[in-house]
């Protein structure tokens, strides 16, 4: 047996732990801290960005969105009525 007692792992293990801690700190500092920079609820590079102050995408007025959605609802109701009338007349 040797007369000097060595610490398990020695200086090499201590250097590895220190390097790993430094790498983890560097990785943590590179991560975005806000959910907006990560992409809240999904990807931040979506194909169509609607009405955010930061985006360079399409800016749509809320009135336009309301008119288009009401027009869509009206067209669906009209198609249902047309289908009912046509089945009663033809069949």
Curated annotation (Swiss-Prot):
Disulfide bonds: none
A single GO cellular-component term on record: membrane
Spans annotated as Disordered: 1-45
Protein name: Protein transport protein Sec61 subunit beta
Domain of life: Eukaryota
Residues spanning the signal sequence: none
Transmembrane segments: 63-83
Single GO molecular function: guanyl-nucleotide exchange factor activity
Organism annotation: Yarrowia lipolytica (strain CLIB 122 / E 150) (Yeast)
């Amino acid at each position: 047996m040797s007369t000097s007692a060595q610490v398990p792992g020695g200086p090499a293990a201590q250097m590895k732990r220190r390097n790993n801690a430094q790498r983890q700190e560097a990785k943590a500092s590179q991560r975005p801290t806000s959910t907006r920079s990560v992409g809240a609820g999904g990807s931040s590079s979506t194909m169509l960005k609607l009405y955010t102050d930061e985006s360079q995408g399409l800016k749509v007025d809320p009135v336009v969105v309301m008119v288009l959605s009401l027009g869509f609802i009206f067209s669906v109701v009209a198609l249902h009525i047309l289908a009912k009338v046509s089945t009663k007349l033809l069949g």
